Amino acid sequence: MTVPYYRDVPTGNALRNFFKIMLKRKGNLFTAIFKELCLFLGLYFLFMVIYRLVLPKSGGQREIRKIVENLLSHQEFTIPLEFLLGFFVSSVVDRWRKSLDSLAYIESCAHAVVIGFPPNSNGSDKNLLIRRTIIRYLVVSQILLYREISLKVRRRFKKLTILGKAKLLNQNEIDKLNKLECKHYDIYFLPISWALSLIEDKIDKENLANEFTILWGQIKEWQTKLSLLRNCDYIPIPLAYPQAVFLAVRCYFAVCVFTRQHLDRYDSKMHTWITFFPVLTTFQYIFMMGWMKVAEILLNPMGEDEDDFELNFIIDNNLKNGLDIVSGLCGNHRKLAEHEIENDCRPYYQTNEQDRKKNRAPPESLKNVEFKSFTMEKASKDSPMVVKSESVCCLRRRFNSSAKKHHDSKV
């Protein structure tokens, strides 16, 4: 589930927000890169020990130093790290945003179902079963798709028989799904077809096609969002692209193990701690590798990371809210009565003065600007504004006449 943190940054206090965000445990940057950072620093110090203690005895230190200096001179030009990461992360975030927009919530469909199949006023609600069945079919269609793209949902609904145990489908409906179930094609569209068949039966019996226009549109939007999620899963970013980026970042820092060493053993500053610990290189590793980890996490938002979508919650939410709406549990308000707010619509806040200042009405930028009293009159003929206007008109006449003469000469 995506880690919430907006509650920790309610104001623009930069220092407070920094510590609040950095001390978050779940979804933390350092948690994501800690193991690889330890591996990088371990290799760095291992090469340092070999270079300073082993190579001087074997006499190969000078040759190794020349190789490292040659790598250092070509490293920044050979691996364009910022360009690769920037373009790749923007592409991944764009696909993540499209997947987020394609998560379907059922409230609009449920309201449209109530409009299409309204409850009877005499107390006997004959349309209640139809409304509940349509909501059930829509939720089942969502489950059938999510179990194909999310391991969490797949683990929850391993087989179609579990839908029967959860009372989402009866045995006859499960048998129909089993007949169509295939390893290569979708079956999520079938419950949507069942829901549409119920609407078609109502139209044929009562000839009420216009009354179901809103419901048709909502079910179509529901199916469109499911199709977009399916397409994002079927057609990912070409595999060679993330391979190139992930390999480039790790190769870059593998080279940094050698090129960021302090190679001069006879430097007078070599005994300070800054010589032995790569401070700036560590910062660069945290930022660049953390940037890449963002892309790795967002690459599949239907996975099992801490920042991935909680699709099981969406399924449960849609089933509960959808059935409540069509069953009338969310309120069947039909009686109209006068209310005091119709005569007194002033805002209602706490009596705390500090809270009142925070919630003050935002006026327009020039709302309370007042000008000194002045009089207005038409401009005289000698006014600069009038002269400027007339001069512009004269220039336009001259330009038009010259253009006309030029055209006549060509003819």
Swiss-Prot record:
Localization per Swiss-Prot or TrEMBL: Cell membrane
Methyltransferase is among the record's keywords: no
GO cellular component: chloride channel complex; plasma membrane
Residues annotated as transmembrane: 30-50, 73-93, 235-255, 272-292
Domain of life of the source: Eukaryota
Keyword Cell cycle carried by entry: no
InterPro entries per the UniProt record, alphabetical: Bestrophin, Bestrophin-like
Pfam families: Bestrophin
Record key words, sorted: Cell membrane, Chloride, Chloride channel, Ion channel, Ion transport, Membrane, Transmembrane, Transmembrane helix, Transport
GO molecular function, one term: chloride channel activity
Recorded topology in the membrane: Multi-pass membrane protein
Subunit structure: Forms oligomers.
Biological role: Forms chloride channels.
Family named by the database record: Belongs to the anion channel-forming bestrophin (TC 1.A.46) family. Calcium-sensitive chloride channel subfamily.
Entries under PANTHER family matching the protein: BESTROPHIN, BESTROPHIN HOMOLOG-RELATED
UniProt name for this protein: Bestrophin homolog 26
